[in-house]
């Protein structure tokens, strides 16, 4: 009988050093400080000027693209994307540990943006000045959740879906372009400041770096051991085909 865990190779990720924890905390603190500093400067200044400068470059095609990105990478859309990839890994490719690694890593990067939103509580850009194309209000401008998820998705693809150095390099380049496009779409729509999307890239990275040593040193070894023991139990209880 085929071993049930043969399609579920261990998913210990790169960068397992515990030193990543203080590094991630420092990066998080720096990112939050950036947000608080930008908030203290008010809505006027270079941050708003860049948003306003994009108004003249709007076109039906770019507006359609930015609107699609806004919908697809909304909180509900993010959950669908995350669930789809995890189910694909776990059920179709029979890699449950990879599914858990991907889902938890992306979630760590994405949800870390909520820490910034709560602490900074920055008001959205004035829609009248940016001529915002969608309605966004409230004190949750810093950082951008859309951009944070895009960055976290790239981290997940590089660390879990790619396997060789070349694959990771190519995935990183393509993913970097993707994250920048999502970030620019938030500015194009007039619902975020440039510092918001920059902070998203930083705080998402901080969340991923915080999670990696926890996954590699505490969680993955235990899950791998449970999976192997469970697979052996099923294998040993299978009837002998010669009986």
What are these regions (language model features)?
Residues 1-81, 119-134:
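N-terminal transmembrane-helix/juxtamembrane module of multi-pass inner/ER membrane proteins
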Residues 2-7, 87-96, 157-164, 210-216:
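Structural signal for the C-terminal ends of transmembrane alpha-helices
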Residues 17-25, 84-112:
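Interfacial segments of alpha-helical transmembrane regions
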Residues 30-33, 107-114, 177-187:
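Aromatic-anchored segments of alpha-helical transmembrane domains
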Residues 35, 51, 113-121, 158, ...:
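Membrane-water interface at transmembrane helix exits
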Residues 52, 101-106, 171, 200-201:
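Alpha-helical transmembrane segments of multi-pass membrane proteins, especially transporters
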Residues 73-94, 149-154, 161:
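Hydrophobic alpha-helical transmembrane segments
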Residues 129-243:
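Membrane-embedded catalytic cores of phosphoryl/pyrophosphoryl-handling enzymes
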